[in-house]
């Protein structure tokens, strides 16, 4: 780890964590105290510039989306999102871009009561963002794909295809659905509690 890496972390990504995070950003690993009778749900998504978002996407939108796509996966399992880890690979350090990216990331974290508890930054030839999200669910209550049975209902929330349309028609109002997806965290938890 370099002085530049620690400077980026301190300036753009270090914030107070939840009370159950005994050790967060700044050490080699984070330490979390798990709630009783809960299971940990973990997922990771990687976003690559030019593949998962257009190169001209605002840094704020990229920050938001990098968190939101992971929270959607946590919600799909019926879990309550808790925290994220961020691995950020940058082609160059751009202070204005980092400020907007971190603002978008924390705007999404704050809206869904999620803490950034660690991660890594490095330099690379291409902008790549990997977020790992952690959530909690009551033991044995996860909604899994493999748990689906013949006769079960398959439900979709939101409008299918809006983000894809926004990608093909940049500048159209539906691009907002591509840039700022809305994780259905409350709905996911309700489905999980209902044992659906």
Predicted regions and their residues:
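Helix-biased detector of long, well-ordered alpha-helical tracts
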Residues: 2-193
């Amino acid at each position: 780890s370099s002085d530049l890496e620690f400077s980026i972390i301190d300036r753009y990504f270090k914030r107070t964590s939840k009370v159950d995070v005994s050790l967060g950003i700044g050490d080699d690993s984070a330490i979390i105290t798990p709630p009783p009778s809960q299971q940990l749900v973990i997922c990771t998504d990687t976003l690559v510039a030019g593949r998962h978002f257009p190169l001209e996407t605002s840094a704020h939108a990229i920050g938001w989306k990098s968190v939101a796509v992971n929270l959607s996966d946590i919600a799909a399992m019926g879990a309550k999102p808790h925290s994220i880890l961020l691995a950020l690979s940058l082609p160059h350090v751009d202070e204005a871009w980092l400020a907007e990216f971190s603002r978008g990331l924390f705007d999404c974290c704050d809206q869904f009561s999620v803490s950034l508890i660690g991660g890594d930054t490095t330099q690379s030839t291409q902008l790549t963002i990997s977020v790992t999200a952690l959530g909690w669910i009551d033991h044995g209550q996860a909604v899994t794909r493999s748990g689906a049975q013949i006769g079960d209902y398959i439900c979709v929330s939101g409008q299918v295809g809006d983000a894809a349309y926004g990608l093909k028609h940049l500048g159209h109002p539906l691009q907002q659905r591509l840039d700022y997806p809305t994780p259905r965290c409350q709905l996911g938890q309700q489905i999980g509690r209902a044992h659906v």
